[in-house]
């Protein structure tokens, strides 16, 4: 018989007692009453918060949206077919958050901040709640720095400033996304982080956008947030808020971010779907009563912070898709009233080969003028006036009236200006080149050149300026203002180049 050592047993027991931890896992639970169409009704979560993240079985998450007397209505962020009646549901006691920070740059993520580009996990150390209060009046300062898009028509006549909300509105297939991509590509070499949020779009379209950004080297400073057409409505509803939370990280860390929401019409439709399934009362066009607040609380988070808060900025470019140019529908009028201006794109202009198809007559930027560079401001006023007079005369000339010489000259000038405002896709122009061509156009140097040669004149003027007068372009870039001395240099370049151009293209002119 083995000898039993009492001291050894005592020490083992003492060691076990010391290592024993008394921990009770307490969690508030409820049970699923019914589930369907991405909505679950839950009984038992009495202390749940509005917008709180809820844990369902099979790693499915949900958000509490309807807090009723005897039940909670929650939207599911995963496959709702895995959930059944009677399943246990747990509170997390935290509001829905997404990962933010440098680790997301160059990545494609879903509305929950999870990577979907196959490049491995994102090692984010910080999380931001998707719903946050917008900065107050005291924390802001007026928009004063330009956010150059590289598009002549926008930077000259509808300028966008850092911290502004500028709506891009138009029918489908009028070039809305192209303007946003140009704006992203134009930030290359700058200090801006760009976030592109795709809401309810085809996956093939999003893949094309990502490829375009990669081909132009823009993914190095961009983040793409995707809630595609095949994703559930709650994911489409969350996507812009997630994109905004990611942008706010850069805004609050004394940096600058641009957030593009493509588009908020589909976002409103997803919210309408959720609201109707949650049995909320419908209003105009079956949208819920708080659809205005849905977009206003999102877009108000774009801001230019004051110096005490780091002077960072978040610029928003929301998109709205209209039906047959109807801007008086519910969602378009809502978003127009929330934003600081709008860029109207028209199908007729697009089809008549004027691209970007911006109707500068009804497009406006309410605060961007304060952010415009002095150089652009000095020449853009004349451009807008000339185009306004041209549109008025063009409408009058349709009646076949005989026009006097000054009116004919005005029509001719307008035709040339419309031509130089055309621009190829994904070819954003730096400020100095925009200044050169717009100055030449508004001062009448293109008036005697055939309209069909305007684009050739423009391309060759850029080449000539770069090769023979690079210091002048650099001076415009650094000064950002046209003083008399610099204006004289620009005039000299344009006159010298025009002489050469007219000599080379004299046969074409005579033929024209």
From Swiss-Prot:
Residues given in the record as ATP binding sites: 170-177
Site-annotated residues for Required for activity: 363
Family: Belongs to the ATPase alpha/beta chains family.
Localization, UniProt: Cell inner membrane
Summary of subunit composition and partner proteins: F-type ATPases have 2 components, CF(1) - the catalytic core - and CF(0) - the membrane proton channel. CF(1) has five subunits: alpha(3), beta(3), gamma(1), delta(1), epsilon(1). CF(0) has three main subunits: a(1), b(2) and c(9-12). The alpha and beta chains form an alternating ring which encloses part of the gamma chain. CF(1) is attached to CF(0) by a central stalk formed by the gamma and epsilon chains, while a peripheral stalk is formed by the delta and b chains.
Pfam families assigned to the protein according to its UniProt record, in alphabetical order: ATP-synt_ab, ATP-synt_ab_C, ATP-synt_ab_N
An annotated Gene Ontology molecular function: proton-transporting ATP synthase activity, rotational mechanism
Keyword Mitochondrion set for record: no
Top-rank taxon, per record: Bacteria
Catalyzed reactions per annotation: ATP + H2O + 4 H(+)(in) = ADP + phosphate + 5 H(+)(out)
EC class (word): translocase
Keywords for this protein: ATP synthesis, ATP-binding, Cell inner membrane, Cell membrane, CF(1), Hydrogen ion transport, Ion transport, Membrane, Nucleotide-binding, Translocase, Transport
PANTHER family, per the entry: ATP SYNTHASE SUBUNIT ALPHA, MITOCHONDRIAL
Gene Ontology annotations for the cellular component aspect, listed alphabetically: plasma membrane; proton-transporting ATP synthase complex
Protein topology in the membrane: Peripheral membrane protein
Disulfide-bonded cysteines: none
EC numbers: 7.1.2.2
InterPro entries cross-referenced by the UniProt entry: ATP_synth_asu-like_sf, ATP_synth_asu_C, ATP_synth_asu_C_sf, ATP_synth_F1_a_nt-bd_dom, ATP_synth_F1_asu, ATPase_a/bsu_AS, ATPase_F1/V1/A1_a/bsu_N, ATPase_F1/V1/A1_a/bsu_N_sf
SUPFAM superfamilies: C-terminal domain of alpha and beta subunits of F1 ATP synthase, N-terminal domain of alpha and beta subunits of F1 ATP synthase, P-loop containing nucleoside triphosphate hydrolases
Function statement: Produces ATP from ADP in the presence of a proton gradient across the membrane. The alpha chain is a regulatory subunit.
Protein name as it appears in the record: ATP synthase subunit alpha
HAMAP family (alphabetical): ATP_synth_alpha_bact (MF_01346)
Gene (UniProt): atpA
